Regions:
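...with weaker cross-activation on analogous glycine-rich loops/strands in unrelated enzymes
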Residues: 1-48, 55, 69-71
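Flexible glycine-rich active-site/ligand-binding loops centered on an Asp-His dyad
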Residues: 56-61
Length: 72
């Protein structure tokens, strides 16, 4: 069985995992945790974790959202 289920963008809740795709393909290259209403927690390569507003840069790259089955 799987520990995560895919959820719709419109059903996203705090701490859902956000998967981001590459600018040039549908390949998932980055992850973050969704924080309502428009923020995420993530770590960029070589950096430290931080909370950031979901700017157009990130919104355009959202691939999918996933929720741990115990958080539903």
């Amino acid at each position: 069985s799987t520990c995560f289920v895919k959820v719709k963008l419109t059903d996203a809740q705090n701490y859902d995992v956000m998967a981001f795709k590459s600018e040039k393909s549908n390949l998932i290259i980055h992850f973050g945790l969704f924080l309502k209403p428009t923020k995420m927690l993530h770590i960029e390569e070589g950096g430290v974790s931080h909370v950031e507003t979901l700017s157009d840069y990130w919104v355009k790259r959202i691939h999918s959202f996933y929720r741990h089955v115990n958080m539903g």
